[in-house]
Amino acid sequence: GMKLKFATIQNSNLKDLISLVKPTSEYSFFNFLYETGRLESHIIANFSFTLRWEYEQYIQWVISKLDTVRMGNEVKLIKEYEEGFEIILKNDIQKPIFTKNISVALGVKPLIPEFLENNLNERIFHNSEYQFHSKKGTKNILIVGGGQSALEIVVDLFNDKNSDIESITMVYRELFTHQMEDSQFAEDKIYTEMGLSNFYKLPSELKENLNKQYRFASDGASPHTIEEVYQILYANRYSKIGKQIKFNIYSECSVCDVTETDKDLDIKVTIENIYSKNQKIISADMIILATGYKQYFPKEIFSDEILSKIKKDDNYNVCISENYSLEYEGKGKIFYLNGGKHTHGVVDPNLSLNASRARKIVLSLDKTFPKPVKQDTIFGGTI
């Protein structure tokens, strides 16, 4: 999803940074609401989902309370050092950091179609940069993708009453926009500690198949966003109030070629039906790639010595233990987060199990840390 004023995260606000493992913590989302003087207003507002901008404020609030967090630093290189690691920062003025263990959680990279990787500019860009690009003067917008981010962009464009937009076109490979599989039964089987533990124990080839099967438990669009977009399009077509924007959807299609021309800043886009192979050329002033993200291992920040001691599987993916530590032959431990769909499943990048991940790491380092209270799930068992 996008960080827009109306955008929400598809998680309960009880699944914050800490509440699932310590509900009485001062760092809970509810304590954030209380300490920022908005708890009563938040309850009265009766939000069905957590607003994305408010969750970001919550994260920043937690960071402000932690003296050990150093923002504005960039890691240049991680090397072996005695019993652990030496972390060299890009700002050479700052002293290196020495530590016994490290946790790496650099997130994901935008997934860009290969033929466009070297052609990104002010008019062709990934949706992660959406808010940094002006739409002023743009008349015809093409959105590639049909997931949550793509739909949120549609809502945002229609809400901009001062825009010059005349047409919006969506192109995506699916037959229709799939909604997120977030039923109670799906949550019970996938987004719980028991569900995660059951998945981790499965053989690799089965995990790969299940990740495809469970895809829309992670990557689908929220039902209320799908409904909102459809209602906006309905009003746009039939209300006869205000400016009408031409809207087209080309489903089961992909973009196969993009040619920029100097004439009127026009972009010629060739789209192709993935089954019939029929092609059509359309024009756009701007292309927004809502094409998702990909996990990657940040090998560029590790020394060759460290990389040579990290075990990989037959598909050259790093081997990750259930407690998120890499299978590493050196001294110290390397914990790796948001890079383990191949080991931990579609739940791996999701915010909902942040607290559980953190607890697993702490328990692996500190055997005196209080053991968790076992939580029951209604249908989480297996044989």
Short names for language-model regions:
Residues 1, 29-32, 61, 187:
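Tryptophan-centered motif/residue detector
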Residues 1-2, 19-24, 127-131, 139:
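Conserved N-terminal glycine/acidic-rich loop preference
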Residues 1-22, 177-196:
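Conserved N-terminal glycine-rich FAD pyrophosphate-binding loop of Rossmann-like flavoproteins
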